């Protein structure tokens, strides 16, 4: 029997009779000799449009819905205005102060170059993620895939991770100063700051990776086992590729926290305005550079310019991560 594809609209009631949503199914197969089963899309008008008077009449009957409507829109407006004001303020203050001097290769008291701090930020971020990334991901794999159900250790680890996530960064800075800088003899250095930041972002990476792994359907694992794959192959060939977007989200969250961190690095990495050439060199990142310029009060304009560069850097990181996650998801779908 020949078949043809036609579009249909299925109307689903939601709430009372006046409030309905329209769900569009783009494809529908139907027998060639049964035209009555085909619904013409163009002949059906949208029925979920209501006038303001109709909405107001409903709100008068249900004042709670009206209050919720006001609160939701008010919260959205406050959020958008706050973020917009912050962005506009930073751009207005910083963009006019962007010039060739602050992009000089070496820092001096005259040009207040941010290039050494920018390069040090890249070093600090990569080194911290290189330490915390594998540990957090493999810890999450153990908790989700290998730990027994009801294991008390899993509960302890999760509670500890959630607690560490809420600890102020200054506490991590003091710990890093006492342990890595003093006890381990690493002094104020790039490696001290990276190790401290790795401990700080480890719970974020571990928890987001754990949630991403738990979101993978059990049918994927069962199908892999049914085809004869072992536990290790299933984890690395089936589960992890499916959880890549969620894992990337955790890494991006960690990256944003590393790039914007100040208090932790003042106590562990120092504030030397030079490009680090060794792991034991004292150095400063963009956030620390901006803080010190603002604190001194002599180069506030350069501090705003640094804030613009830092803002652009974070936006680019998030944009790149979204593109990578989208590409991975598209490749997986294909």
Residue ranges of predicted features:
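Transmembrane alpha-helical segments of polytopic membrane transport and secretion proteins
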Residues: 1-74, 322-334
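Interhelical loop and adjacent transmembrane-helix boundary motif
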Residues: 110-112, 265-311
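C-terminal transmembrane helix and the adjacent membrane-cytosol boundary/short C-terminal tail
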Residues: 143, 214, 252, 292-334
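Glycine/proline-centered hinge or cleavage motifs at structural transition points of membrane proteins
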Residues: 168, 227-228, 241
